[in-house]
């Protein structure tokens, strides 16, 4: 296998942290979560700070996942990660999950899976769940 495109949700669940930040932003800044770019232009920096402060509560490293990522990397497999979540949140999550050093390419936001497959080239295997990831090796 030359390359894998792993959904970030296979490595860890970012949804609770994202939801909590949106709730906090709505309360603190009185903004609509669907209109962040218009109502809160620096929302990405605020999200990153919020995520960095709270990441240890939300993310735990998984020894089996870490071992699989190490094995893939050692075998020469290119590893890419994709997510619909904002890049700022994805980078913090990867760092706290201990996966950042194994990842060659990260794509985030709408269309991330399509972009990661283009970056990794033909034949990249898509992995959507932790179970699929652990079954790769």
Question: Whereabouts are the PLM-identified features?
Answer:
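Asp-based, Mg2+/Mn2+-dependent phosphohydrolase catalytic module
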Residues: 1, 70-73, 87, 91-137
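Active-site neighborhood of HAD-like aspartate-dependent phosphohydrolases
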Residues: 1-39
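Generic recognition of short, well-ordered alpha-helical segments
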Residues: 16-20, 63, 92, 137
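A generic structural motif
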Residues: 31, 76-78, 102-103
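Short, basic/glycine-rich phosphate-binding loops at helix/coil junctions
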Residues: 42-52
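Short, acidic loop-to-helix structural element flanking the phosphoryl-transfer center
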Residues: 52-81, 91
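Conserved phosphate-coupling serine/threonine residues in phosphotransfer and NTP-handling enzymes
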Residues: 83-85
